Amino acid sequence: MNRIIRGVIQYNQKIKAGLVKQFEHVSDHPNPTAVMFTCMDSRMLPTRFTQSAVGDMFVVRNAGNMIPAAPNYGSYSEVSINTEPAALELAVKRGKIRHVVVCGHSDCKAMNTLYQLHQCPTKFDVSSPMDQWLRRNGFESMKKLNERLHIGPKTMKFESEVAPSQSFEAIIDPMEKWSAEDKLSQINVLQQIMNISTHEFLKDYLEAGNLHLHGAWFNIYDGEVFLFSKDRKRFVVIDEKTVPSLSAELERRCPLPEDKAGDVVIQNLH
């Protein structure tokens, strides 16, 4: 806590005045362009590596950047009472956000734990909120990791029953560069996108092309940021060489000229 208090003092001396001016501007012209679901890991600093300013982006953080799937496909009688679906409704239905980004990372402690629980089921603690959270929301990701480890770096299908337009294919770690846990982390990003697509209140937005779901991944070891390319079916590092093709893909897949879709995502992540 002393570190936090000292940090507030430095904030008061060096940052507060400029930040208050930004708050004043945003209060008159709020224009967030995306909502990002990312991990609570202290090494993950999404506003840093996206260079986002005040008012640019909603950020929702939890263990493992997970978004619970809707409890029943097509059911209007049941509501998933969780922070994440509520945040989606706030951002998309009420805030008119058109881009949702799920961002995972390497050496994710939540993914490491999920993998360990699968390797040794007896470690599962029924009284642990963490274990229950991971098992409930990471089960499909774990199934897909098993498939990936069995078939190797081949095409895998991610299919949405509620919003078929959101289905896609992916090749996870084609160069066999990452550990099983990091493969799981990348798979989990894509599976959480599928989970988002299960929510009926988003179906019309998705099917009409008014909402776009993106997968990103951060390598904490070298600071590189990756974006999932549906064209290439893999995570692609964002750098000067790949920006033109990634931007072109986003502009084609996210035809929203009023907010320059390709620029929104790439500029936020690059």
Swiss-Prot record:
Encoding gene (name): bca-1
Organism superkingdom: Eukaryota
Full protein name: Beta carbonic anhydrase 1
This protein's UniProt keywords: Lyase, Metal-binding, Zinc
EC number, as in UniProt: 4.2.1.1
Keyword Plastid assigned: no
Keyword Magnesium: no
Required cofactor(s): Zn(2+)
Entry's family note: Belongs to the beta-class carbonic anhydrase family.
Catalytic activity: hydrogencarbonate + H(+) = CO2 + H2O
MF annotations from Gene Ontology: carbonate dehydratase activity; zinc ion binding
